[in-house]
């Protein structure tokens, strides 16, 4: 066993947390040669439930799981961590305006950013999952200015996986045949799943799927609205698929990307493709296993540019609503 990774998981007793913790402990996130210590952060009221999850983790006797703890104290939960998986956030309730949600969650992520900066290991990386994840990530990052901006990520991999599944189903091929699929912008109903640059079995999607109206219409809408569809169907938001997106994102960051392929996450914009510098914006990315880069030179046609503009405007608007927290 080569090393031990300390991972903080916030909102650990929630649905996504429950699906995620066992996958971390089993080695699916960091690999079969990496031991893990899990430090759960939960609200005081949820500590008993979290302790029940700890009992279950213990009962799995995972060889890689060295230690698991739970705390409601930020300093304790983030002590010397190498990874922070910020899953917990306040969900939008009936009658709640989006601006209210941004501000309520903003306060949470201000404090978490400060606590991570104060307590985490020098090599910490942070993945924000709790929605609205792009702007929550922006807030936390701006309250932890001592941590390099290239260590902050927000999750769009679930959207990428949803898009791949839709395209594979339409083309009648296994999902592994779908590659080069990037998600641009916000993890919201404005995101743009970039089918024009996606490949199916190495060929452009537009050559394989002849129904271009479906691609430009229902395909994008299906990906954008998938979360709402799942809530309608099961009476709760997607949890196992979101947890899978977290695992896939971390794997994408720490594993070299296959030549010519990409993976999706939101990172701090350096101005690439005209996305405003400093925004947390979804891009197609590549990794060498250590450093993550925005893939350059991707061609965006007029259709794509229009979609890009819509999601970019939404992220600028969200940023402006929480300016006093940055």
Swiss-Prot record:
Xref: HAMAP family: Malate_dehydrog_2
Reactions the enzyme catalyzes: (S)-malate + NAD(+) = oxaloacetate + NADH + H(+)
Alphabetical UniProt keywords: NAD, Oxidoreductase, Tricarboxylic acid cycle
Family stated for the protein in its record: Belongs to the LDH/MDH superfamily. MDH type 2 family.
Superkingdom assignment: Bacteria
Matches recorded under InterPro entries: L-lactate/malate_DH, Lactate/malate_DH_C, Lactate/malate_DH_N, Lactate_DH/Glyco_Ohase_4_C, Malate_DH_AS, Malate_DH_type2, NAD(P)-bd_dom_sf
Gene Ontology biological process terms, A to Z: malate metabolic process; NADH metabolic process; oxaloacetate metabolic process; tricarboxylic acid cycle
Gene3D superfamilies: Lactate dehydrogenase/glycoside hydrolase, family 4, C-terminal (3.90.110.10), NAD(P)-binding Rossmann-like Domain (3.40.50.720)
Purpose of the protein: Catalyzes the reversible oxidation of malate to oxaloacetate.
Protein name (Swiss-Prot/TrEMBL): Malate dehydrogenase
EC number(s) on file: 1.1.1.37
Residues annotated for NAD(+) binding in this entry: 11-17, 105, 112, 129-131
Entry annotation: catalytic residues: 187 (proton acceptor)
Residues reported to bind substrate: 92, 98, 131, 162
PANTHER family given in the database record: MALATE DEHYDROGENASE
EC class of the enzyme, as a word: oxidoreductase
GO function term, MF aspect, one: L-malate dehydrogenase (NAD+) activity
Family matches, as Pfam families: Ldh_1_C, Ldh_1_N
């Amino acid at each position: 066993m080569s090393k031990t990774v300390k991972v903080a998981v916030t909102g650990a007793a929630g649905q996504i947390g429950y699906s995620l913790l066992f996958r971390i402990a089993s080695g699916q996130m960091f690999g079969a040669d990496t031991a893990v210590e899990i430090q759960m952060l939960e609200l005081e009221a949820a500590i008993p439930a979290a302790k029940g999850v700890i009992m279950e983790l213990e009962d799995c006797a995972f060889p890689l799981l060295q230690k698991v703890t739970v705390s409601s104290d930020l300093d304790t939960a983030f002590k010397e961590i190498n990874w922070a998986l910020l899953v917990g956030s306040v969900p939008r309730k009936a009658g709640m305006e989006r601006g209210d949600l941004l501000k309520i969650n903003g306060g949470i992520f201000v404090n978490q950013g400060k606590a991570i900066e104060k307590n985490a290991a020098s090599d910490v990386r942070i993945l924000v999952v709790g929605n609205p994840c792009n702007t929550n990530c922006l807030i936390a990052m701006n309250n932890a200015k001592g941590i390099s901006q290239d260590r902050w990520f927000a999750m769009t991999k679930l959207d990428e996986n949803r898009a791949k599944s839709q395209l594979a189903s339409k083309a009648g091929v296994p999902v592994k045949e779908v590659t080069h699929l990037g998600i641009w912008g916000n993890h919201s109903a404005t995101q743009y799943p970039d089918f024009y640059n996606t490949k199916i079995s190495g060929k452009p999607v537009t050559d394989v799927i002849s129904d271009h109206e479906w691609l430009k219409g229902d395909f994008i809408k299906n990906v954008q609205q998938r979360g709402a569809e799942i809530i309608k169907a099961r009476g709760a938001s997607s949890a196992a698929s979101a947890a899978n997106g977290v695992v896939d994102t971390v794997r994408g960051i720490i594993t070299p990307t296959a030549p010519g392929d990409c993976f999706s996450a939101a990172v701090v914009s350096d101005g690439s493709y005209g996305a405003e510098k400093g925004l947390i914006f979804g891009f197609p990315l590549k990794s060498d296993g250590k450093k993550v880069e925005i893939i350059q030179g991707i061609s965006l046609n007029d259709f794509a540019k229009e979609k890009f503009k819509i999601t970019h405007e939404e992220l600028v608007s969200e940023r402006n609503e929480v300016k006093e927290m940055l």
